[in-house]
Amino acid sequence: GNLLQQMYNTADSIIVGNFVGSNALAAVGSSGSPIYLLIGFSQGLAVGAGVVVSQYLGAGDHKETREAVHTSLAIAVVMGLLLTVGGVACGRALLVAMNTPAEVLADAVTYIRIYFGGVLFSVVYNMTAGILNAAGNSRRSLVYLAWASVTNIVLDFVFIVGLRMGVAGAAIATDLSQLVSCVLSLRFLMKSEDACRVELSAIRLHRKMAGRIIRVGLPTGIQNMVISF
């Protein structure tokens, strides 16, 4: 799953490099490190959610399973919104701190701000994937991610080659493709007949449950960030 998600940025880089130019390629590449860090951290929290959900499922405790599922999604929404605001507001400062070359900085800022504008979809997908894995549906989450990866490549050609939108087009394509995987996985969970069934009105933070999920997932998230860095 991590490899497929990293392919978003890889596909953007290849198509931008071939059809826009070397500076645009460098701009997309400069944005890769913080994006990989984000993917790793959100997947770590998703692992924590999956562990907690699977424990309650194994114990046959449907009430706690439902609470864990809906708390996990609430964590994802909060984290996604915080990352959106932080990424859009601080994207330029982050790239400057990473010593991004001046000649590619403007394009890099455009790419990373648009990417973080849609990062909520990626974070929510990662959390739903953790829930699906806990429920024994890991193959389905990978299929949804594969569909999103194909969508990203198609939209890259539409926005970059067809509409000549440059790095902005690449970032928009990535956001829309992540929306695809997010919607597909949420739709499946909303139609599920087991304890992992999602009801949008039930998504809320239960403090004790949120603390448990974060305690389990945080070490993995930090480890993933270190590996990605």
Locations of regions flagged by a protein language model:
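Alpha-helical transmembrane segments of multi-pass membrane transporters/permeases
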Residues: 76, 131-155, 172-175
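Short alpha-helical transmembrane segments in multi-pass integral membrane proteins
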Residues: 53-120, 162-218
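Transmembrane helix-bundle signature of multi-pass secondary active exporters and lipid flippases
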Residues: 1-51, 115-122, 211-229
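Hydrophobic transmembrane alpha-helices of multi-pass small-molecule transporters
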Residues: 37, 152-157, 182-186
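Small-residue-rich hydrophobic transmembrane alpha-helices
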Residues: 13, 25-85, 122-141
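Transmembrane alpha-helix boundary and packing residues in multipass membrane permease domains
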Residues: 2, 14, 18, 51, ...
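Helix-loop interface residues and adjacent transmembrane-helix termini in multi-pass membrane transporters
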Residues: 7-10, 19-22, 56-59, 134-135, ...
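Hydrophobic/small/kink-forming positions within alpha-helical transmembrane segments
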Residues: 44, 85, 149-153, 179
